[in-house]
Amino acid sequence: MSETYELKAETRERVGKGSSRELRRNGLIPAVIYGDKQPPLSIALSTKDVTMKIHAGGFMTTVATIDVDGKKIRVLPKDYQLDPVRDFTMHVDFLRVKKGSQVSVQVPVRFENEEKSPGLKQGGALNIVRHEVELNVSADNIPEFLTVDLTGLKIGDTVHISNVELPAGATPVITDRDFTVATIAGRTQEVEETEEVTEVEGGEEEA
């Protein structure tokens, strides 16, 4: 689990596009805290502080504390919007979380020991099907990432979610199947399949 942190915020009295633009001009980000059967709370945060946390990594999997005018609220980031042109943070949504509460989180997947995979050594390719896995997990036990060990994997092998070690008490949101996280594909096979498709398409055009 990533190390928690605290952000200072102030309550927003006004909402709407005009108010949000004014906040951004003053170096602040509009945000909302919702959940826990309480009314949504509109707040403003330092653009610099939030941007630093986002770029540091683990932002969406780290429980934080927001000090709103002296009142500390425990939250988990659920969404944020970036300006498509200038790439700065436009808005953030936070979910209130209590101690031990269950949350649904998209957790990044990391792959290790590629050099110990016979399939990759033979020229195979790591085909990543899921870069993230959505988990139901305690807010106090959210992993920063899930680790997939590629040791011993050969061409044609598949890594299913059942092969991935999850934190205690965590379960995948998808429960109706043992879904694929990654496979070791053969490059030669991929080339042959591409050539076959090209030949078929060429034959159809001639016909």
Curated annotation (Swiss-Prot):
One of its GO terms (cellular component) is cytosolic large ribosomal subunit. One of its GO terms (biological process) is translation. Pfam families: Ribosomal_L25p, Ribosomal_TL5_C. The keyword Ribosomal protein applies. The keyword Ribonucleoprotein applies. CDD domains: Ribosomal_L25_TL5_CTC. Residues 1-21 are annotated as: Disordered. Coiled coil: none annotated. Gene3D superfamilies: Ribosomal protein L25, beta domain (2.170.120.20), Ribosomal Protein L25, Chain P (2.40.240.10). Keywords: Ribonucleoprotein, Ribosomal protein, RNA-binding, rRNA-binding. InterPro entries: Rbsml_bL25/Gln-tRNA_synth_N, Ribosomal_bL25/Gln-tRNA_synth, Ribosomal_bL25_b-dom, Ribosomal_bL25_C, Ribosomal_bL25_long, Ribosomal_L25_dom, Ribosomal_uL5_bac-type. GO terms for molecular function: 5S rRNA binding; structural constituent of ribosome. Transmembrane segments: none annotated. This is one of the proteins that binds to the 5S RNA in the ribosome where it forms part of the central protuberance. Part of the 50S ribosomal subunit; part of the 5S rRNA/L5/L18/L25 subcomplex. Contacts the 5S rRNA. Binds to the 5S rRNA independently of L5 and L18. Belongs to the bacterial ribosomal protein bL25 family. CTC subfamily. This is Large ribosomal subunit protein bL25. The gene is rplY.
